[in-house]
Amino acid sequence: VIKIHILALSLLALLPATNALATVCVNEKGVPTEVHYDLTDKFNSSNNQVGQVVTLSEKSQWVGVNAVCPKGTVGNTTKRSYVTDYPVTGTSDGYQYLKLNDYLDGAMKITDSYAGAFYPPKNYIQMGSHPNVSKNKPFGVQDSSLIFRLKVTRRFINMVVIPRATMFRVYVTTTSSDPLTTPVYTISYSGIIQVPQSCAINAGNVVEFDFGDIGASLFSKAGVGNKPEGVSSQSKTIAIKCTNVEANAMLTMRVEAEKVSDNVLVSDNPDVGFIIANESGAPLTPNNLTSKIPFRLDDSAQAQVGIRVWPVSVTGNKPAEGRFTSRGYLRVDYD
């Protein structure tokens, strides 16, 4: 028994020494640098087809990032790892495509002064040597010539807004066994992709529904997801007119919103929201590609689509008294 206890103590004593051998280099400024790629572009009609690939303008300059490795680092060579939270959807010409949204996949090629061209995500890529690596002094991360490709996975109308997001976190280490814990820099992206195919909804005007005054206690009595007693839904017919979209094309209309709880658009009063439904009263689920109203354009590339809206309780609680509003977006897509 005594020997077993001594052995356990010996192993514990060795653990700190093993961890101390890990070499994780960091940004010289103490925080990761963000290298941002603006994806804003205008596609032509032939680009807006499933499977089409568009290569964006090269971000040719050096990323401008310096790293520093900890004291006690042995050797002057480093490795870099490019880590993403997105799954790889496919590979073509070396490019590894990641899903950016419901319409576009994105992929990147990067060139290093030593390693040459490579296609992230990839871990522990062998890079060159710099005398400052072992001296606890800054050295350049020589990434340049960032080339971004977009692949259309679903045709779209008007535009796609791509919110700012991180595509890769870049780590610098000295061996392939070092943990990837502290990024030296990140590669982010955002932008707006426009296409010639467009549809004007309600002639570009806001579609408004005004339900007047509703007693606050009626929402708590109604319960979660239910309409207050005595309040009727409101219906409107939305005019749609398309340009550069073939006549008689099958399209869909769906709802997008920023604040959502299940199929409810949450208002600026968190206890109250609205449901948007088709003209038959079947609710639409916001931000869901499969929850949609199908329709066909006429010979003039126009259509009329009916929707219904009603207020509901989001939480089942009695809401604070006062005016409440909610905002959503109607989006037209190819079916």
Language-model-detected regions and their locations in the chain:
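Cleavable N-terminal signal peptides
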Residues: 9-10, 20
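Mature extracellular/passenger domains of Gram-negative fimbrial/pilin and adhesin proteins
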Residues: 21-335
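Bacterial N-terminal signal peptides that target proteins for export
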Residues: 1-8
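N-terminal signal peptide c-region/cleavage motif recognized by signal peptidases
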Residues: 15-19
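Intrinsic-disorder-associated interaction segments
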Residues: 1, 13-14, 141
